[in-house]
């Protein structure tokens, strides 16, 4: 079983313990689909956790049992996955101009960390742990193992698309200025 499968098992146990059973596993193609433009920003069948489904259908109701509106949900990235080297990826898909998304992207980054830590520690209290996670130093674990990826539509963000292209030519990663606060 992969590390991602182990993590998904823990997430499903968490939901089950609270009386929820939703399919939170998806793929990049479905998770990156924009209903507005009717396209997927990523054409891949890589398995991911659909963070929006988890946040809106289960986590919101667990932490806010009286909530009747999905608007009460925490803001999360769209997708989450773990590779074989135990690097965690939160992926945000933006089919909009980035100037409209800067604050939301940063809030989502912190909300993701909070929600995942909340689940990990809640399950630890039930003697169910995700062994690769460092429960003794979670902040260091997140700094070392978590990567936040922002996928955007180049046509709507020509400046960022050009910067990305220039950085690729130099074999460098492109990090928009507003995301440097996440380093």
Predicted regions span which residues?
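Conserved catalytic cores of phosphodiester-cleaving nucleases, focusing on short active-site segments
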Residues: 79-81, 87-95, 112
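Catalytic cores of nucleic-acid endonucleases
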Residues: 96-158
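Polar/charged alpha-helical tracts
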Residues: 6-13, 122-125, 162, 180
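Polybasic (Lys/Arg-rich)
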Residues: 161-183
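Short, charge-rich binding segments
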Residues: 70-72, 80-84, 137-141
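Beta-rich catalytic cores
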Residues: 75
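Acidic-basic catalytic patches of nuclease active cores, encompassing PD-(D/E)XK
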Residues: 1-70
